[in-house]
Structures are given as C-alpha cells and as structure tokens.
C-alpha cells in the first residue's frame, strides 16, 4: 500500500479563528478610514517584512486587519499573509523599534518608546524559537536620545512568544511601570487635553463605524462547482446581503464539513 506524503503545517498557531477575529475587529475601521491610516481616530503605522526582498514594509494604507496581522506574523509561529503579491511577515525581523518611521511620518515632539525585547542571544539547542530568532531577526538599535523622547524598558527574561495565558500579568507590569514614570513623562509633555472630551470624540468616531454587511465572496483555490457549493453556505440569492454572524456560521459549517 502506497503511503501518502506527509505535509507539515505552515504554522504552529492555526490562523483560522484569528483571521476571522481580525475581520470583526478591523474591517469597520478600514471602511471608515477608506484605507488611509491617517484618517483613523489615532493615525496609525506598523511595520511588516518582505523577506524575499529583505526589506521592511511600512503599512500606511490598505486593509487595517491585514496590516496588523502581517506585522505580527513571526515565521513558523503564525502563517504569513500576502499583501499586494508580497508574502509578509513580522516587522520585527528588520525593524523591531521603528522610531525612524514615527519621526519621518509624524514628526512628533516626543516619542515614548517601549522596549520589551532585546537582540537575539545565543540560540538554545532545546528552544526552537531562540534558534529561529537567531537565524531570522536582524540586530535592532533600541536607543532613543533624550532629546527625542522617553524609553520604558521592561525585562521579560522568563516570557516566551507563546505565553498568551500571561496576558493580564504582562499588561499589569506594563501599566504599573508606566504609571511609576508618569511624572517624568508629564514633565516632557506640556500640552494637556480634557479626558472627557477625548472620550466623547472617540465615542462619536466609534458610533460612525459601519456595520459589517456582505454581498460578494471571492473564493480562491476551488473549481467552479466547489465555489457554487461554498457560496450557498453564505447565501442562496447572489443579491442577498448577509451579516458577520452569517459569515461566522457559514465559515464554521464549512470547516466542520471539511
């Protein structure tokens, strides 16, 4: 009996539910800003990596969810995504402290930098993540002159890439450390705004986010008969509008059938 070839998974973390969550979280904001990240409530940048051309990609426009997803796709851990025909990975590969991007795009008076990692150390033969970091990650300059801003440095020697269950613990460490330095931060930033006013403007912005509604589905990697069958899971009538809840139900039905 011939044995079937064994295919290795493309990532340790299954991206199926994560990709769907990113649509729910970021698609309304993408529609609201019309793909221009300068038009978000807080103008946004992130960095991804084009490993084929060995360069960073500065994400200023497009699909917000794809940009964030690309910027965190550490090789092997998370499956990369394709943006404009380029396979994109974690931006930290080439620039893990993109203060240069902030200065070039926003010209800030003060940068508050948060350092939660360091340059790769000597790899451990029992730790595949440390081996990957040593092979992939480029050296990063984590310095920030006092004239440009303030550095918050955190030492997380016992934290690994997959420690998602420690989210609250790590959040609290970051929050408490920042609060302890608040006097220093405020001494560098003289402008003050009313917190209630900012909260109100944020509420107005979020209230204008469009509801997720769908009409067309683009399917890749299936023949015409399979495409028709898949589309029927989402809607019987090609002109029918359906909601994100409909998408989730159909999506997981298809996964369970598979």
Feature roles, as predicted:
Residues 1-258:
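Patatin-like phospholipase
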């Amino acid at each position: 009996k011939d044995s079937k070839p064994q295919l290795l998974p493309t990532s340790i973390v299954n991206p199926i539910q994560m990709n769907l969550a990113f649509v729910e979280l970021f698609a309304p904001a993408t529609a609201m800003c019309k793909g221009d990240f300068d038009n978000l409530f807080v103008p946004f940048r992130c960095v991804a990596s084009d490993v084929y051309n060995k360069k960073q990609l500065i994400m200023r426009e497009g699909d917000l969810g794809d940009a964030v997803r690309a910027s965190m796709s550490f090789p092997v851990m998370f499956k990369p995504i394709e943006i404009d025909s380029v396979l994109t990975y974690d931006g930290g590969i080439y620039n893990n402290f993109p203060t240069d991007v902030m200065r070039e795009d926003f010209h800030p008076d003060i940068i508050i930098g948060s350092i939660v990692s360091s340059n790769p150390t000597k790899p451990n033969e029992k730790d595949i993540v440390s081996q990957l970091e040593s092979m992939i990650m480029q050296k990063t300059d984590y310095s920030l002159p006092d004239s440009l801003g303030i550095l918050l440095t955190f030492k997380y020697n016992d934290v690994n890439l997959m420690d998602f269950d420690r989210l609250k613990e790590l959040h609290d460490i970051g929050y408490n450390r920042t609060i302890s330095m608040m006097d220093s931060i405020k001494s560098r930033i003289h402008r003050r705004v009313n917190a209630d006013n900012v909260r109100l403007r944020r509420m107005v912005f979020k209230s204008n986010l469009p509801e997720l509604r769908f009409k067309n589905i683009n399917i890749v990697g299936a023949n015409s008969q399979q495409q028709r069958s898949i589309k029927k899971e989402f809607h019987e009538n090609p002109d029918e509008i359906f909601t994100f809840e409909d998408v989730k139900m159909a999506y997981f039905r298809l996964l369970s059938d598979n």
